[in-house]
Every structure is written in structure tokens, then in C-alpha cells.
């Protein structure tokens, strides 16, 4: 019988420093804003907050840290906004820099009244995290009357995945694993694919069948579940509520375009999907008709749909889209005459065009991917990101990148 070594609870819960996010919060230290950490459930918001607290303790003296985690029963008695306010005021220390951290803030009903009141006193540096369905980007301006800054946290990037496993010796194998496992790092604690998949499923189902249903008082979850699965299965396809409602109804899930439109908005508000609008490159204008929707993490697609319709070209396109958003780009789908450019990425004055593919070793596929890029007449960079497994090279002014290399670049 094989000998098994049992480890203590927590031995598998390895953590890494998510430098990009930590540096961003450090930049905001002391600014007169409420710092709000958002992101999908289990994306690492609480871990980021804890890392920042450790940074403060290690680098500053004469500080007072007031930390409240509403998941901890210790704070059960202050899950009422008057009590929360009183607790913070009681723990204020005169003559010190007072930091207030509230984790899972949505568990205190009307928390915004307490936070706004504390903010108005001008004596706390305030940081909060909350569930993705209850601390929505769209709601922040309504909830918080003072100035606020949102720090949006994504699941692990491929670079962070490699950092977690402390290995880039075989980046191709690691990338193959990442495309399936995704970036929800809590799943990495499990030894088997089945257990990892179950973890991801539970996170996803909690968002769809509990968080969103509770937030929006939905009568049932069937349409929402089928819609979400449809969007996963149709990544990279142009989509409209009217078209989706017709397809769902034809497949024994009766609904209408109004409901579909609302539910898509809910899924995007909760950061399950990101909507990418179209941009007319020649006319230099944004288009209102049809959009594309990309899933927050490729691991969710595999956990929910399995290998069904496992089109790696679409999976890679999804990974590239989320990476562009993670790097702070505004992302659009490009339209040029009758052709389509997978992504137009813009950040300040920087702009470039991207085509994403799986295998471009065949001449016909290679020419098909190059064709739309070659028709663009401006001087902005153009690139193809594909599974080449070769160093970067150029063709007719187009940079050809291996996807694993490109993901590790920044």
C-alpha cells in the first residue's frame, strides 16, 4: 500500500505577493479616498488586504490598525451600522495614523452609512472589500458619498500561476495547465483534477445561484444558469439579447430579450463576464449593436462545460482579453469593412491591434489571421498572439508572439 504523508491544514495554502495590486494600494496610502477592493468571489481580495496590513506593520511606526472581518464570529455583535461606527470610534487612537480595514463589509446592513460617517471625520484611512454581487462598480457612486478609488482584482494571471508553482522551466506545460485550471488560486490546494474542478464549480454556483439571486430577488436560477453557460460556450461570438433569448427559448428555456439583457448585466456587474464593445476602425466610432462577452477565468469554463466544444482558439482569446483588462487597457472588438480584428487595446496614448489564434502553422490559417491586420492603414502596432512555441518574429510589420511568452512579458 502506498504511503501517504499527511500535511497540516494550511500547508497547501501557499500565498504569493501580488506585487501589481500591492504596489497600487501602496501608491494610494494616505490619499483622501475610500479604497474599495473589488473582484469576483475568491479572487484574492482579502489576501491582498492582509498583505497590505503586513506591509504597513513592517514599514511604519506610530500607526493604529483597526481591522474588522465580518466572516469572523468575533465581530458578530457589530453587524449593525451604528455598532460598527461605535466600534471604530472606540478604537481610534489620537496622535497616530489610523487605518480602518473592513473585510466582507456587505455583511453589515447599511454599512455605507457607517463608512460615510467615518470618512467625513477625515481621521481614518479607509479600505473595504466585499462580495462581488453586493459591492458592484455600478453601485459605488450611490453607496459612498465621499471620494473613492476602486482597486479591481482579477484571478491569477499566467505570470502569477508560474510564480505560485515557482517554475518556468517548462512554460508550455504550465500554460496548458493554466488554460484548464485557470486563476482561482484556492483550487490549487487540491491534489486531483476532480477536487479542483469541484472547488471552482462551487465558487461559480455560489455567485450565480445565491449571490445574484439574493441581490436582485430573482424568481429562479434556470434562465440565469442557461444564459451563463450559453455565453461560456459562445466566447468570441457577437451576441445580442434578442438572439440569445431566441436560442434559449428554442432549447426549452423560455425567456425574452428583456430578461436576457438584464441577466447579462447582472453577470457583468458581478465580474463573471466582461462585455467588450465594437469599434469601427475606419470610421473611428464605437458601435452599439452586438457585443462579445468574455469569462473572468478560463478555469470556470472548463469546470462547468468540461471538454465540450473545447475550442482552444476561443479559450486563448478569452485569456488574452482578460490579460489586457488586467494590464489596464480599454479593450474593443475591431471592425474594418467586413473584417473583424479580435482586439483593439488602448491605454492612454498607447494603442495596438491583436489577432488571437491557436495554431497558425498552416499557410491558410496564417494568411487569414494576417489579412485584417494588413488592411489597417494607421501606424499603430499590430500583432498575432498564438500557440507558436517559437520566439517572437515579424511578418510584414506584424509581430508574431507565442501566447505563453506574451503572457509572461509584463
Predicted features along the sequence, with ranges:
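Conserved lysine of the Walker
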Residues: 45
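Short glycine-rich substrate-engagement loop in P-loop NTPases that contacts/grips substrate
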Residues: 66-96
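N-terminal pre-Walker A segment at the start of P-loop NTPase domains
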Residues: 1-26, 30
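Domain-level recognition of nuclease-like catalytic cores that cleave nucleotide substrates
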Residues: 389-410
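Hydrophobic positions on the alpha1 helix immediately C-terminal to the Walker A/P-loop
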Residues: 48, 52
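Accessory nucleic acid-recognition modules appended to NTPase machines
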Residues: 66, 193-351
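Hydrophobic anchor at the beta1->P-loop junction of P-loop NTPases
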Residues: 37
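Interdomain motor-coupling "hinge/lid" segment immediately C-terminal to the ATP-binding subdomain
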Residues: 2-10, 131-133, 138-238, 271-274
Amino acid at each position: 500500500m502506498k504511503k501517504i504523508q499527511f500535511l497540516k491544514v494550511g500547508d497547501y495554502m501557499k500565498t504569493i505577493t501580488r506585487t501589481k495590486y500591492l504596489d497600487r494600494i501602496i501608491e494610494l496610502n494616505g490619499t483622501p479616498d475610500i479604497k474599495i477592493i473589488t473582484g469576483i468571489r475568491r479572487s484574492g481580495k482579502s489576501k491582498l488586504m492582509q498583505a497590505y496590513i503586513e506591509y504597513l506593520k513592517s514599514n511604519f511606526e506610530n500607526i493604529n490598525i483597526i481591522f474588522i472581518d465580518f466572516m469572523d464570529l468575533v465581530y458578530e455583535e457589530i453587524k449593525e451600522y451604528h455598532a460598527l461606527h461605535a466600534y471604530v470610534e472606540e478604537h481610534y487612537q489620537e496622535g497616530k495614523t489610523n487605518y480602518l480595514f473592513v473585510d466582507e463589509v456587505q455583511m453589515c446592513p447599511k454599512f455605507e452609512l457607517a463608512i460615510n460617517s467615518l470618512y467625513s471625520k477625515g481621521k481614518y484611512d479607509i479600505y473595504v472589500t466585499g462580495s462581488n454581487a453586493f459591492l458592484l462598480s455600478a453601485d459605488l457612486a450611490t453607496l459612498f458619498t465621499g471620494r473613492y478609488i476602486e482597486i479591481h482584482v482579477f484571478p491569477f494571471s499566467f505570470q502569477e500561476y508560474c510564480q505560485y508553482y515557482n517554475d518556468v522551466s517548462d512554460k508550455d506545460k504550465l500554460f496548458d495547465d493554466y488554460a484548464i485550471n485557470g486563476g482561482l488560486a484556492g483550487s490549487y490546494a487540491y491534489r486531483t483534477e476532480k477536487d479542483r474542478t469541484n472547488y471552482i464549480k462551487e465558487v461559480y454556483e455560489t455567485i450565480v445561484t445565491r449571490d445574484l439571486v439574493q441581490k436582485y430577488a430573482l424568481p429562479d436560477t434556470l434562465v440565469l444558469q442557461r444564459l451563463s453557460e450559453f455565453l461560456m460556450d459562445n466566447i468570441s461570438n457577437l451576441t445580442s439579447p434578442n438572439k440569445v433569448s431566441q436560442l434559449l427559448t428554442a432549447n426549452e428555456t423560455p425567456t425574452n430579450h428583456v430578461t436576457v439583457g438584464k441577466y447579462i448585466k447582472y453577470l457583468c456587474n458581478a465580474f463573471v463576464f466582461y462585455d467588450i464593445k465594437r469599434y469601427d476602425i475606419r470610421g473611428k466610432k464605437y458601435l452599439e449593436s452586438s457585443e462579445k462577452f468574455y469569462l473572468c477565468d478560463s478555469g470556470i469554463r472548463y469546470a462547468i462545460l468540461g471538454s465540450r466544444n473545447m475550442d482552444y482558439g476561443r479559450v486563448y482569446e478569452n485569456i488574452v482579453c482578460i490579460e489586457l483588462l488586467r494590464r489596464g487597457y480599454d479593450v474593443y472588438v475591431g471592425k474594418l469593412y467586413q473584417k473583424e480584428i479580435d482586439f483593439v487595446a488602448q491605454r492612454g496614448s498607447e494603442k495596438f491591434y491583436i489577432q488571437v489564434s491557436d495554431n497558425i502553422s498552416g499557410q491558410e490559417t496564417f494568411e487569414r489571421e494576417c489579412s485584417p491586420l494588413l488592411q489597417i492603414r494607421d501606424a499603430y502596432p499590430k500583432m498575432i498572439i498564438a500557440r507558436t512555441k517559437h520566439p517572437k518574429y515579424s511578418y510584414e510589420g506584424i509581430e508574431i508572439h507565442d501566447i505563453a511568452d506574451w503572457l509572461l512579458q509584463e
